[in-house]
């Protein structure tokens, strides 16, 4: 049984691709037709591939695997944080710092710094510092929160990464390929499916399309982890 209906996908605008002249020919198998110079994605395949992806994700979550959600563009940022938090996953929704995965030990030291500053803030220690020093600490805390808040509880590399907008998140995808971290990705018509482990062809620009797909993925993570707890 499909995890999503064609009418839900249509309503969310998941079928709208990019202008035909901007396409990646490798996406041809997932394109239904061209209309007014815009490629239309085959939603039958979207529903099938999303269902298969969610079954895989549920099984992985049941085994205790951890997921990192990534989407730094405006349309995705809110959904990414919301669904990652809901499913007890990690997320990056502001800026991908180069080496976030491939140079994890350095990034981890910044995460530990964030944790220390937050503890100092909660204990009121920052307020007790001289005015200038307190201001420096608060600026540092704000910057670290902005970039690292979604991974501050991540003690090791994630088992899987869920990506919105392959073209934008190239650096992260290259890091995952280098480290062998499987990539689950919403693929628009300008993307390359050959470098993605679990492709989900769909509109990666429309908020409703992003939310529909990412929330189904989060549901599957929750189902898997809940089943494991109640075993």
From Swiss-Prot:
<dbReference type="GO" id="GO:0003735">
    <property type="term" value="F:structural constituent of ribosome"/>
</dbReference>
<dbReference type="InterPro" id="IPR023591">
    <property type="entry name" value="Ribosomal_uS2_flav_dom_sf"/>
</dbReference>
<dbReference type="GO" id="GO:0006412">
    <property type="term" value="P:translation"/>
</dbReference>
<dbReference type="GO" id="GO:0005763">
    <property type="term" value="C:mitochondrial small ribosomal subunit"/>
</dbReference>
<keyword id="KW-0934">Plastid</keyword>
<dbReference type="GO" id="GO:0009507">
    <property type="term" value="C:chloroplast"/>
</dbReference>
<keyword id="KW-0687">Ribonucleoprotein</keyword>
<dbReference type="InterPro" id="IPR001865">
    <property type="entry name" value="Ribosomal_uS2"/>
</dbReference>
<comment type="similarity">
    <text>Belongs to the universal ribosomal protein uS2 family.</text>
</comment>
<keyword id="KW-0689">Ribosomal protein</keyword>
<dbReference type="InterPro" id="IPR005706">
    <property type="entry name" value="Ribosomal_uS2_bac/mit/plastid"/>
</dbReference>
<dbReference type="InterPro" id="IPR018130">
    <property type="entry name" value="Ribosomal_uS2_CS"/>
</dbReference>
<protein>
    <recommendedName>
        <fullName>Small ribosomal subunit protein uS2c</fullName>
    </recommendedName>
</protein>
<dbReference type="Pfam" id="PF00318">
    <property type="entry name" value="Ribosomal_S2"/>
</dbReference>
<keyword id="KW-0150">Chloroplast</keyword>
């Amino acid at each position: 049984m499909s995890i999503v209906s064609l009418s839900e996908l249509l309503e969310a605008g998941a079928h709208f691709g990019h202008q035909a002249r901007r396409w990646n020919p490798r996406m041809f198998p997932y394109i239904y037709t061209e209309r007014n110079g815009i490629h239309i994605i085959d939603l039958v395949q979207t529903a099938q591939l999303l269902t298969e992806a969610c079954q895989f994700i549920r099984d992985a979550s049941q085994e205790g695997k951890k997921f990192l959600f990534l989407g730094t563009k405006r349309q995705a940022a809110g959904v990414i944080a919301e669904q990652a938090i809901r499913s007890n996953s990690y997320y990056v929704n502001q800026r991908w710092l180069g080496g976030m995965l491939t140079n994890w030990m350095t990034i981890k030291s910044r995460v530990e710094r964030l944790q220390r500053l937050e503890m100092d803030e909660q204990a009121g220690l920052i307020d007790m510092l001289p005015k200038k020093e307190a201001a420096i600490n608060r600026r540092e805390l704000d910057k670290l929160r902005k970039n690292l808040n979604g991974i501050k509880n991540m003690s090791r590399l994630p088992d899987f990464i869920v990506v919105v907008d392959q073209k934008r998140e190239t650096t992260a995808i290259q890091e995952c390929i280098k480290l062998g971290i499987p990539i689950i990705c919403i693929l628009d018509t300008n993307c390359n499916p050959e470098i993605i482990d679990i492709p989900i062809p769909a509109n990666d620009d429309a908020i409703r399309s992003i939310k529909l797909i990412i929330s189904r993925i989060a549901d599957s993570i929750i189902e898997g982890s809940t089943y494991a707890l109640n075993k």
